[in-house]
Amino acid sequence: MNRFSDIDWSFKKLPPAYGFHSVELVSIDKALQPLEKQIKELSRYVKIAKKYCNFPNEHNLSKDQSASIYIYTMEWQETSLYRVLNEALRSEDRESLKIWFPYLKLFDTALDRLPTVKGVVWRGVALDVGKNFTKDQAFTWWAVSSCSASVNVIEKFLQNKKDSTLFLIEAINGKKVSGYTQY
């Protein structure tokens, strides 16, 4: 599984994750420090993200903001940051999200500086989940959803599996992170 095809189709009715906007903006090291017990070798991946992130950059992101996007896109084992974060965002235990608030604040302030995407983006899952959705259905994905403007990118991740589902999403307020990712 990767961040382009990670999806939860349980349609949970969860309350929003209120509160992260009001926490202090801190460095990526400080934001992720409380998660080091949950994510193996996290401090190593933070160093890699800070080394290779796009800084300086055209959108005036700080090094920590740029690294917060970069580390989200990094793939490593089952404890990749995006997997653990999205698992927490999908959890019914909303209190467990508080440990993520400093990172979410940093990540959100970074995304706020990036261009907004309006129009068609693509997402896929290597399972046939089409029966769980209807045309024009509105629902909330309780996770950070990586998409691509190119259907070919998503098809590559799906590897031509017969039972795959390809989503065409009409984005209203997406963020273009290309240029800030590991790829």
Residue ranges, per PLM feature:
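Intrinsically disordered, low-structural-confidence terminal and linker regions
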Residues: 1-31
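Internal glycine-rich, Lys/Arg-flanked active-site/core loops of soluble domains
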Residues: 29-176
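Conserved nucleotide-binding/hydrolysis modules and their immediate coupling elements
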Residues: 180-183
